[in-house]
Amino acid sequence: MSTKVPIYLKRGSRKGKKEKLRDLLSSDMISPPLGDFRHTIHIGSGGGDDMFGDISFLQGKFHLLPGTAVEEAEEDGSFDLPFQFTRTTTVCGRELPGGLSPLLKNAISLPVIGGPQALTLPTTQAPPKPPRLHLESPQPSPKSSPQEAGNVDIWRVPEAGLPHNGMSPEPEAEEPFLSHASSLLSLHVDLGPSILDDVLQIMDQDLGRVQIPT
């Protein structure tokens, strides 16, 4: 048989036939869920001065801890309770009592998932919006003066008899232009006499050719 096959699969039946994989495996070979793998308990070489977490598994047998600090703690009566839960550090940043080892000062217990000490991501603010491009020119308000509305120059037709730029206007050059453009409501259309006569002649010829049936 191949050497790549695991040892527990190298069993053969008495008849020399290979057994199927589902016949060899059973539910006992599958391990149950192991739960949380977080580092919640720590006991260092210093004994009582270098431990944190749930130490209830000791059941009051603190003399089994290494170091001489345990004997002093037993004399003070600090380990009288058989099931004691100690947590020397938290994530809240509280100050530790003096006399502890440097390992305990750096040790931080992980917070409970979903608890009040759970870490939260900082809220990010939305980036500011870019300034809008004003493609259209701003329209001046009706109450604004010409100086406030972009210094718009308004040209007016000089009245007759008044000097313009220190010079008197020429009446002969302005009279024919002003006579036709003085009123905006007046409309002068000159089609010429020949066009109207031609149109009337064509209409008369068409009417003469039409014969009324009797």
From Swiss-Prot:
Disordered as annotated region, ranges: 118-151
Sequence ranges assigned to domain CRIB in this UniProt record: 30-44
One term under GO cellular component: plasma membrane
Modified sites of kind Phosphoserine: S31, S101, S137, S141, S145
UniProt-listed Pfam families: BORG_CEP, PBD
GO biological process, one term: cellular response to type II interferon
Molecular function via GO: GTPase activator activity; opioid peptide activity; small GTPase binding
Bilayer topology term: Peripheral membrane protein
Localisation: Endomembrane system; Cytoplasm, Cytoskeleton
Domain of life of the native organism: Eukaryota
Matches recorded under InterPro entries: Cdc42_effect-like, Cdc42_Effector_BORG/CEP, Cdc42_effector_prot_2, CRIB_dom
Keywords on record: Acetylation, Cell shape, Cytoplasm, Cytoskeleton, Membrane, Phosphoprotein
UniProt record similarity statement: Belongs to the BORG/CEP family.
Quaternary structure annotation from Swiss-Prot or TrEMBL: Interacts with CDC42 and RHOQ, in a GTP-dependent manner, and with SEPT7.
Domain writeup: The CRIB domain mediates interaction with CDC42.
Function text: Probably involved in the organization of the actin cytoskeleton. May act downstream of CDC42 to induce actin filament assembly leading to cell shape changes. Induces pseudopodia formation in fibroblasts in a CDC42-dependent manner.
Protein name: Cdc42 effector protein 2
Source organism of this protein record: Rattus norvegicus
Lineage: Eukaryota, Metazoa, Chordata, Craniata, Vertebrata
